[in-house]
Amino acid sequence: RPRSDDSLQTLSRLLEDEYGHYLPSDELNNEAEEMSPAASLPELNADQSDLELPWERESREIGGRPFRQEAVLARLLKDLSNNPLRFRGRSKKGPSRGCFGVKLDRIGAMSGLGC
């Protein structure tokens, strides 16, 4: 449904009251006249595609070489396969670990109770 000019003026006045201290009113009016939302989006996307942020450039070059995520993932998987993980489960004759751990009782039964 079409909006009346009264409702648009009311909305504009409310927004100026709420956010007017961030921008002077003459800047608000100039920006509103210069930009339409549909026209500004393609320009914004085109401008941002050419920008390169410093941390993006640094993340691609580590140690003077181009950074490739596939190579890092392959190296990580290779390291995991070459180094077996130690199983830290309970063993029947493991050492007493004291409070809040596994403790060997007098009769040789394992328990996880206190000190």
Curated annotation (Swiss-Prot):
The keyword Secreted applies. CNP-115 is differentially processed to produce CNP-38 and CNP-39 in the heart and CNP-22 in the brain. InterPro entries: C_natriurtcpep, Natr_peptide, Natr_peptide_CS. Keywords: Cleavage on pair of basic residues, Disulfide bond, Hormone, Secreted, Vasoactive. GO terms for cellular component: extracellular region. GO terms for molecular function: hormone activity. It is found in: Secreted. The keyword Secreted applies. Disulfide bonds join C99-C115. One of its GO terms (biological process) is blood vessel diameter maintenance. Residues 24-49 are annotated as: Disordered. Hormone which may be vasoactive and natriuretic. Has a cGMP-stimulating activity. This is C-type natriuretic peptide prohormone. It comes from Scyliorhinus canicula.
